[in-house]
Amino acid sequence: MTRSPFRRLVFGTLRRLLYLWVRSETINQSSLTLNLDRSRPVFYVLQSPSLSELAVVDAECTKAGLPRPVLPVSVGPLMEPAAFFYLTPEPDWLGRQDKRGAPPTLTRLVNTLSEHAEENAQIIPVSVFWGQSPESESSPWKLLFADSWAVTGRLRRLLSILILGRKTRVQFSAPINLRELIEHNKGHERTVRMAQRILRVHFRNLKTAVIGPDLSHRRNLVKGLVNMPLVRQAIADEAEREKITPEKAKAQALRYGNEIASDYTYTAIRFLEVVLSWFWNKIYDGIKVNNIEGVQKVAQGYEVIYVPCHRSHIDYLLLSYLLFKNGLTPPHIAAGINLNMPVIGSLLRRGGAFFMRRTFKGNPLYTSVFNEYLHTLFTKGFPVEYFVEGGRSRTGRMLQPKTGMLAITLRSFLRSSRMPIVFVPVYIGYERVLEGRTYLGELRGASKKKESIFDIFKVVGALKQRFGQVAVNFGEPIKLAEFLDAEQPDWRSQELGPNYKPAWLNETTNRLGEQVARHLNEAAAVNPVNLVALALLSTTRLALDEQAMARQLDLYLALLRRVPYSPHTTLPDGDGLALIKHVKDMDLLSEQSDALGKILYLDEQNAVLMTYYRNNVLHIFALPALLASFFQSSSRMSRDQILRYTHALYPYLQSELFIRWSLDELDTVVDQWLEAFVEQGLLRFENNVYLRPAPSSRHFVLLTLLSKTVAQTLQRFYMAISLLLNSGQNSISAEELEDLCTIMAQRLSILHGLNAPEFFDKSLFRHFIQTLLEQDVLRRDEAGKLSYHDLLGELAEGAAKRVLPAEIRLSIRQVALHRVDGAAEAAVEPQPPKPEESR
């Protein structure tokens, strides 16, 4: 563009037009002036072709009185039409660019100086940065267009000039003496390559210092994926299976790689930091971070895989933000392909998201590329984040783990265990989840809607609400090697086959998923909303006197301090009255006053929503609630009786709620809870027997409300058992039992005024039946029909009798007895309007 008089004239005109808007300055002009030998020819080198950057350099040289890059310069007999060149050669007229080729100007300079020992030349690397460094920039709009490591197109460069051009900075680096390189006597070609290498390293180091490190592995990694042995084999198999050429199959693999891979940029991380800092301060009253010190220790020397619970679309943004603010590398995040949409998908990808399809079934090539991508992340030590629950929990419970990503991780580790892997559970507890209103329909029983990032925008109108605080608790890490040592002691010496799928993989992966879920629940953050929901949803009319509620909340806190759920569980500050005030301030509680005091209650909408927050901590209160349930039908029980019934029911509660204590620990933990009950006046211990308080006493009310925490769960168990016993041996399949349980639960929810759709959630019945099979209480015959052990009858008439009121048991048995004649009608008969009260 500038290598002829006419082109220089055009260039000068363009430069003047550019500077109608652009304002530039040189960062370190004094250091350049001190090191420059003005008696020697000067050549400027820019990293890549850019007319706008050349114009800025030319303007700064003119301003500083330096030789201009666009004017001719001579070195001995060599006459160059311009005193600059690009390290990456300019494209030809067809747009082709040989990135590995040497700049012609540099080659001619080396040749000339090699032949004329008396001559010399100086090369000055020059970098142009549009706008401030990401570290200094506070405008999210400007950060979107700030310099990055990504290849910049013409449109983006134009936008960068328009948005950032008023703060353009030019950095002249120390001159490189070309004669000193030639004196190494390495020959012309090697000297040129050495000069190129020095310049590449220089530009990379300078760019790192100014805009931050190059966090993206995308440019090189995707091309490398298709050359890995397992992917090459998958490409060959794809070509043979689809009757296409290997080249086409390889091109398809490359497309998959580009679809999957993240494109980390420091600029995007800074953009998200600026935007999210504003967002958190705008929405939340604060973010509490607990136990991050353990993560900072374990991050050194381990491949860290963060496994958070999934309650909101902002979970991954929040976690990446907190890790970055605490000096930890933000992870590469597994995101559903539905989030890979224009603008949003690009920003998420540059913030570390890699995208995965919902199913890999029927696409072995995609599976191979995805597995290889994750294997590369793991072995290179990039931190990774994925959600073992799969999708967001719409009910507030910990969902059953989806083990696909865990299986890929396990297989990768079996393939190469040089980089040890550690799973870090992260519990994110919201006092008010951002998408709460969008969950209301599903909490009322509507079918689950397809996930979309636009769910976030649907709640913009509700941002005037108070969202309280967020707690982020890091749980106990799980070291994968230690886990495998316990599960498969000889895993290191086993023959694993070419696909690294040992026979024990599925079972071990399932146990790993359960352990991750338990560790997540151990790190729960109990907040005021959880406790208020727990108390009010345990009442018949969803209402309590304010003082009675304060006593109930104080009881919850006292019990959890006396018998901590785990060292990683956190509790709120303040007493019961302070917690009530906090929840009232968030407009989640309604209040009515009379002469006797204040009555606190839940309106219809908040009653449904509060089931979500109760479910967050259901696992923490399940065992003490079960113990309290024993004393609803019995006024006195011995320790042996309590332990016998607890052992009968606990495995099913533990399996559904991922409770942390093993059966071996159960006796000790039960004793601790019973001691706490005695200390709080909920029970008395006399003559080796535990006695409940008088039914008219305040303590009996507290004990009763505590017992209601797991009432619906125990009722579901009893439903399934009653239907099985009334069906007889080998007469019903698991699928038929699920359907009947769902119909029966729907009917009972209408009869008893329950507005809690999880009461008739088919997946919960399915899991209970599966647990009965695992406990060998049930068995399947060859036709898939269920037979049961005598223990099932004992479970129904022994344990259930102790924990469920007689009227509830009678109602369930009556519906179960009429299942044959009434099941079909119950499924289709019109339902009366839902009652006003819900719990």
From Swiss-Prot:
Entries under Pfam families matching the protein: Acyltransferase (PF01553), GPAT_C (PF19277)
Membrane topology label: Peripheral membrane protein
Annotated motif HXXXXD motif, positions: 309-314
Keyword Coiled coil (UniProt): no
Major localization listed first in the record, in broad terms: membrane
SMART domains: PlsC (SM00563)
Enzyme class: transferase
Any one of the GO BP annotations: CDP-diacylglycerol biosynthetic process
Reaction(s) catalysed (UniProt annotation): sn-glycerol 3-phosphate + an acyl-CoA = a 1-acyl-sn-glycero-3-phosphate + CoA
Cellular localization per UniProt: Cell inner membrane
Keywords: Acyltransferase, Cell inner membrane, Cell membrane, Lipid biosynthesis, Lipid metabolism, Membrane, Phospholipid biosynthesis, Phospholipid metabolism, Transferase
EC number from the UniProt entry: 2.3.1.15
Pathways involved: Phospholipid metabolism; CDP-diacylglycerol biosynthesis; CDP-diacylglycerol from sn-glycerol 3-phosphate: step 1/3
MF (Gene Ontology): glycerol-3-phosphate O-acyltransferase activity
Matching InterPro entries: GPAT/DHAPAT, GPAT/DHAPAT_C, GPAT/DHAPAT_LPLAT, GPAT_PlsB, Plipid/glycerol_acylTrfase
One CC-aspect GO term: plasma membrane
Family, per entry: Belongs to the GPAT/DAPAT family.
Record's comment describing the protein's domains: The HXXXXD motif is essential for acyltransferase activity and may constitute the binding site for the phosphate moiety of the glycerol-3-phosphate.
PANTHER family, per database record: DIHYDROXYACETONE PHOSPHATE ACYLTRANSFERASE, GLYCEROL-3-PHOSPHATE ACYLTRANSFERASE
Name by which UniProt lists this protein: Glycerol-3-phosphate acyltransferase
Higher taxonomy: Bacteria, Pseudomonadati, Pseudomonadota, Gammaproteobacteria, Pseudomonadales
